[in-house]
Amino acid sequence: MKLTCVLIVAVLILAACQFTAANMARYGKTQIARSDVKSIDARRPKCCCVCGVVGRKCCSTWKDCHPVHLPCPSSG
């Protein structure tokens, strides 16, 4: 009986460890993916957008550029 209890506890601990390892691996992959997105976004050049009659405005991301993407002038 004692041996059975020890085996059950050992199996439960092993299962918990595997579950934790799988979750950590999944979480690690998610973290890597997020940091890749950030670094890709940081490498993109800042763009200048034509904003109607108001004129040009520099945006932090390409997503902010609407409706036209233009390269920033070298003077600016």
UniProtKB/Swiss-Prot annotation:
Main localization category: secreted
Q: How is it modified after translation?
A: May contain 4 disulfide bonds.
GO CC aspect terms: extracellular region
Q: Which GO terms describe its molecular function?
A: toxin activity
Annotated compartments: Secreted
Q: Which UniProt keywords apply?
A: Disulfide bond, Neurotoxin, Pharmaceutical, Secreted, Signal, Toxin
Annotated tissue distribution: Expressed by the venom duct.
Task: Please list which residues make up the signal peptide.
Answer: 1-43
Family statement drawn from the similarity comment of this UniProt entry:
Belongs to the conotoxin O1 superfamily.
Q: So what does this one do?
A: Is able to inhibit the growth of Mycobacterium tuberculosis (MIC=0.22-3.52 uM against strain H37Rv and 2 multidrug-resistant strains). May also show neurotoxic activity.
Notes concerning its domains = The cysteine framework is XXIX (CCC-C-CC-C-C).
Q: Could you tell me what this protein is called?
A: Conotoxin Cal29b
> Source species, please?
Californiconus californicus
The upper taxonomy is: Eukaryota, Metazoa, Spiralia, Lophotrochozoa, Mollusca
